[in-house]
């Protein structure tokens, strides 16, 4: 998988209690296939944060990567906005 074709997501950090790992909540709006109602879908991704620079509430950009552990398949690309 080439680096340019990997999936990227933007979400916010909801947990930073692990070493070099943060949990990122990604919200997505999808339409119901039959009824057309817009629904909010959320996913939590365990993300590799090599420098431990993220804090709770930060808005971050993450990218798919090779499996780093049992649950970690994403890595931090950049911090879009620091929490206040």
From Swiss-Prot:
PANTHER family for the chain: 40S RIBOSOMAL PROTEIN S11 FAMILY MEMBER, SMALL RIBOSOMAL SUBUNIT PROTEIN US17M
Record's subunit section: Part of the 30S ribosomal subunit.
Keyword rRNA-binding: yes
A GO BP entry: translation
Keywords: Ribonucleoprotein, Ribosomal protein, RNA-binding, rRNA-binding
UniProt organism field: Alkaliphilus metalliredigens (strain QYMF)
UniProt cross-references to InterPro entries, sorted A to Z: NA-bd_OB-fold, Ribosomal_uS17, Ribosomal_uS17_bact/chlr, Ribosomal_uS17_CS
Family: Belongs to the universal ribosomal protein uS17 family.
Name the record gives this protein: Small ribosomal subunit protein uS17
Entry function: One of the primary rRNA binding proteins, it binds specifically to the 5'-end of 16S ribosomal RNA.
């Amino acid at each position: 998988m080439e680096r340019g074709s990997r999936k990227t997501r933007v979400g916010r950090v909801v947990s930073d209690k692990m070493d070099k790992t943060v949990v990122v909540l990604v919200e997505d709006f999808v339409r119901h296939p039959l009824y057309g109602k817009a629904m909010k879908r959320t996913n939590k991704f365990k993300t590799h944060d090599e420098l431990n620079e993220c804090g709770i509430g930060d808005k971050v950009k993450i990218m798919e990567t090779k499996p780093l552990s049992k649950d970690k398949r994403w890595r931090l690309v950049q911090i879009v906005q620091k929490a206040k």
